[in-house]
């Protein structure tokens, strides 16, 4: 089995080579699929992420969610710690792109100071680098989503990816959290 580092390198390279037209078609399909998932339909709070480096663009869901009366939230890293402490991730209220700023890790964050209090009607839509169809996930190595989900087991989770991000097997550790769903342009796995 390849190491997480080797898998990250290979998948990130493949994702970076995905042309913008193919990516756009894929993430439009992925977002439409999410709209039909029960945990999205019942969610009052929808946590999205600001895509970077050719990630699936789930911000297409922001407008639809707000039109449906859902509150939309995006991640923010706080207390960026020392070398041995990665920091903490919270979700701030999303109020539109004109109310954002580039934060740590060059990720766009909301300027809102309102922080999500996750509940049973909270849905977290999360990125990742690589996945298996048994819902194992490799992120970027910071553990932000894993820690957030360990602290908030009541939330529903959907991970999104392109088919090219799916691999046969991933080494998993005790702290690695599986999403409830993995959604790609061709499949939904639960």
Label every model-predicted segment.
Residues 1-120:
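N-terminal active-site beta-alpha-beta segment that forms phosphate/nucleotide-binding
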Residues 81-190:
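Conserved phosphate- and dinucleotide-binding cores of soluble alpha/beta proteins
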């Amino acid at each position: 089995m390849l190491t997480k580092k080797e898998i990250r390198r290979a998948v990130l390279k493949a994702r970076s080579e995905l042309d913008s037209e193919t990516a756009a078609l894929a993430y439009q399909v992925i977002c439409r699929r999410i709209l039909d998932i029960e945990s999205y339909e019942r969610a009052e709070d929808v946590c999205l992420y600001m895509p970077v480096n050719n990630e699936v663009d789930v911000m297409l869901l922001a407008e639809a969610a707000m039109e449906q009366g859902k509150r939309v939230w995006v991640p923010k890293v706080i207390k960026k710690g020392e070398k041995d402490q990665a920091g903490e991730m919270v979700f701030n209220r999303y109020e539109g792109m004109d109310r954002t700023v580039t934060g740590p890790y060059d990720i766009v964050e909301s300027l809102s100071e309102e922080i999500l209090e996750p509940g049973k009607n909270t849905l977290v839509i999360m990125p990742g680098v690589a996945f298996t169809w048994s819902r194992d996930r490799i992120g970027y190595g910071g553990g932000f989503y894993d820690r957030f989900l360990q602290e908030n087991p009541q939330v529903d989770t959907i991970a999104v990816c392109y088919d090219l991000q799916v691999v046969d097997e991933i080494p998993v550790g005790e702290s690695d959290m599986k999403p409830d769903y993995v959604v790609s342009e061709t499949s939904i796995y639960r």
